[in-house]
Amino acid sequence: MSLLPYAWAKAQRALLRPGEHGATLLVSPRTPGWAISEVRQRHAPASLESVRDDELDTLLASAYSDTGSAAAVVGAAESEVDLDRLMDDIPEVTDLLDTQDGAPVIRMINALLTQAARDEASDIHIEPFETHSVVRYRVDGALRDVVAPRKALHAALVSRIKIMAQLDIAEKRLPQDGRIALRVAGRPIDIRVSTVPTGHGERVVMRLLDKQAGRLRLETLGMAPGVLAPLDNLIRQPHGIVLVTGPTGSGKTTTLYAALARLDASTSNILTVEDPVEYDLPGISQIQVNARIDMTFAVALRAILRQDPDIIMIGEIRDLETAQIAVQASLTGHLVLATLHTNDAVSAVTRLVDMGVEPFLLASSMLGVLAQRLVRRLCTHCRVEEDGGWRAVGCPACNQTGYSGRTGIHELFVIDDEIRRLVHQGRAEQDLREAARAAGMRSMREDGERWIASGSTTLEEILRVTRDA
């Protein structure tokens, strides 16, 4: 935290950092002399330190990203709501810390977004009830309460968010979807906004997409060597289908992005069809579906097949038409990467057959299926060892949850010649699973044993995320 307003500190290239023995004034070669004199006169810093200009940017972002405590803003906002300020126009992309607007509702929303980014929340829920509202963050896959504003503040919060997302603030009877692009402490954040009417007002969910998070590599996703090496071999095949399966929020898209980043976009024509485009991938053409204008997955896929693609990524195979186009594309010399909603890897074959894809086509086109879940990591500050394992406790570092961060557990179903023969014959799912196990496939629960042994998570956490697997 600093004692100087962020906009002034950024413009004048000065950071006043409190310390045990007095404040330190950090400056760069671009800091004007009059600004140094003014800070010295007003705050009497104990010392002066010069840093590189780019280093000062990093220090500014770090210091001021901790000033947006949502709970600290709620009290002031509840007592002074200025609805007229909600209609103020805002720039298309802005850094929240640059905002000098004093309207309490705007300050509160800025604080909520800043704190969510700092806590690495994936979603913000704003839920209305009879006497109050509740704001919750989803962190590491679990929801937790953040603040509970009075009910009188709810409509103002929703209206401001709808303005930021360019939604119709007068329409309160129908669901609406929008998008906000902004920066928080220098980090580009894309926010998908969804509103739905309820009996006590509009409910809002904001999905936060940190664009820098899309630069992950497969090696950082927690895959065992016995999964990473064969998966790397699958995605380097010239044609065929590789699927990633799991429930919503299990990291499927992140895995596909990491796989695409592993491939050479300079020598291959890589195109994606997504709903929505979550992260920008350099060197890759990304297409977003739009149901309002009938730009469906199937329509987009037919179009990109005329774009001379080498590799195609499909955000999700949702229907027979999309599945058939994906299969035909793989049979005509294209590598297709896609996601599918199934509980485990083997059931992906059953799901596609149930959709209406012929087994002989799947046998000819499929290369493999990766199923995955995300498990919470134990907080290293407070975990305790007992009975040969580890237990979550809770401390300030992990917001009393006992967990901090997540990692993946996986099972990789490689379609070898024997399994290909079984698929062609239309054999039962259990026969495919037995053949895969005989070939060395490990289940997600078995994969999770290594994280339990290393003290990274607990047996309860592995069982929680694999109940349906």
From Swiss-Prot:
One of its GO terms (biological process) is protein secretion by the type II secretion system. Its main location: cytoplasm. Induction: Induced by phosphate limitation. The keyword Nucleotide-binding applies. GO terms for molecular function: ATP binding; ATP hydrolysis activity; protein-exporting ATPase activity. It is an enzyme of class 7 (translocase). Disruption phenotype: Mutant cannot secrete the low-molecular-weight alkaline phosphatase LapA. Deletion mutant shows decreased ability to express outer surface PstS, but not intracellular PstS. It holds the Pfam family T2SSE. Keywords: ATP-binding, Cytoplasm, Nucleotide-binding, Protein transport, Translocase, Transport. ATP binds at G246, P247, T248, G249, S250, G251, K252, T253. The keyword Transcription does not apply. It comes from the Bacteria. It is found in: Cytoplasm. It catalyses: ATP + H2O + cellular proteinSide 1 = ADP + phosphate + cellular proteinSide 2. ATPase component of the type II secretion system required for the energy-dependent secretion of extracellular factors from the periplasm. Acts as a molecular motor to provide the energy that is required for the export of proteins. The Hxc system is involved in the secretion of low-molecular-weight alkaline phosphatase L-AP (LapA). Is probably also involved in the secretion of the phosphate-binding protein PstS. NCBIfam families: type_II_gspE. This is Type II secretion system protein HxcR. The lineage of its organism: Bacteria, Pseudomonadati, Pseudomonadota, Gammaproteobacteria, Pseudomonadales.
